[in-house]
């Protein structure tokens, strides 16, 4: 069923009172995060516990870039200071279309963790990848695994119509279509890059430590005979022994020794390789192919 609602505030109040899982869709600067906060603020004010899942791996408001983050909210005051995350899931890229499987699993995993932690309402703030095969594939599989009973599509013009049509053909879900939030500022690519760099800078805030690591601690497993120097500057997810991401790290190779630089080394059991190299002076990233890094192809 398709519902058109003109008032963002009216819909936020309705979802805050009635919904259990809401997924927000929209391109860049359409107001997904603004609406997510409206819903969370209204729900917590009414005494509900909200699990906010931010799946924007490029510019997350909860966790660092390259991660999906989840925050459990019980008070309206927490909505404005939504970081840091209560749980992270490392994806390892800034472009969800590059690693669709990892992105979908990360989102679904944190939706489930929010429910297990006692959330009455889960709000999923998705990425801005909404067009073409990559966008539709990403949103289709998120719907499959997260199973929201309400979807909100924010759009300028009619760019969301293909995804809306697809969801209505394949899923029994109520879709609300709203125009883009008029008060949301449109950010330039340079502004987004600066926000991304600041998010990574916070993820590598002091105190940082160097931890020597063995080649056996990685996922995916390193091939036999790999020149470990090829891993230098790769971004990694630091994981405990329970499948949870503790934060980010950066691999450093020097004098035949491989180390990870991180501020979350306590409890570290394994490292997940990302698909980015990180410059710790500028906090700029460069995408890489793990297949090329490990196999030269």
Each predicted region: which residue ranges?
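Preference for solvent-exposed, low-hydrophobicity sequence contexts
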Residues: 1-17, 24, 42, 149-297
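Nucleotide-state-sensitive switch-loop elements of NTP-binding domains
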Residues: 2-25, 46-47, 51-122, 130
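The conserved Walker
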Residues: 28
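Conserved lysine of the Walker
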Residues: 32
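Hydrophobic positions on the alpha1 helix immediately C-terminal to the Walker A/P-loop
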Residues: 35, 39
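A generic local secondary-structure boundary/capping motif
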Residues: 41, 57-61, 140-142
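Phosphate/Mg2+-binding loops and adjacent switch elements
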Residues: 113-173
């Amino acid at each position: 069923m398709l519902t058109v609602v003109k008032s963002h505030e009216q819909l936020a109040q309705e979802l805050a009172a009635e919904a259990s899982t809401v997924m927000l869709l929209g391109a860049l600067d359409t107001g997904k995060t603004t609406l997510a906060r409206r819903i969370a603020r209204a729900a917590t004010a009414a005494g509900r516990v909200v699990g906010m899942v931010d799946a924007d791996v490029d510019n997350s408001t909860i966790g660092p870039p390259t991660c999906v983050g989840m925050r459990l909210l019980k008070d309206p005051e927490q909505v404005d200071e939504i970081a840091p995350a209560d749980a992270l899931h490392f994806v390892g890229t800034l472009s969800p279309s590059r690693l669709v499987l990892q992105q979908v699993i990360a989102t679904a995993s944190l939706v489930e963790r929010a429910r297990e932690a006692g959330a009455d309402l889960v709000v999923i703030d998705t990425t801005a990848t909404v067009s073409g095969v990559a966008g539709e594939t990403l949103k289709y599989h998120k719907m499959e695994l997260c199973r929201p009973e309400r979807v909100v599509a924010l759009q300028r013009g009619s760019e969301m119509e293909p995804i809306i049509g697809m969801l209505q053909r394949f899923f029994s879900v109520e879709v609300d279509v709203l125009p883009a939030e008029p008060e949301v500022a449109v950010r330039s690519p340079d502004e987004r890059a600066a926000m991304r760099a600041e998010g990574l800078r916070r993820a590598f805030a002091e105190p940082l430590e160097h931890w020597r690591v063995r080649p056996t601690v990685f996922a995916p497993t390193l091939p036999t005979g790999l020149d470990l120097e090829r891993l230098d500057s790769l971004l990694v997810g630091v994981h405990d022994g329970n499948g949870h991401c503790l934060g980010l790290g950066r691999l450093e190779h020097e004098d035949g020794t491989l180390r990870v630089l991180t501020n979350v080394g306590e409890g570290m059991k394994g490292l997940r390789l990302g698909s980015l190299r990180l410059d710790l002076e500028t906090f700029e990233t460069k995408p890489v192919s793990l297949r090329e890094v490990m196999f030269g192809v």
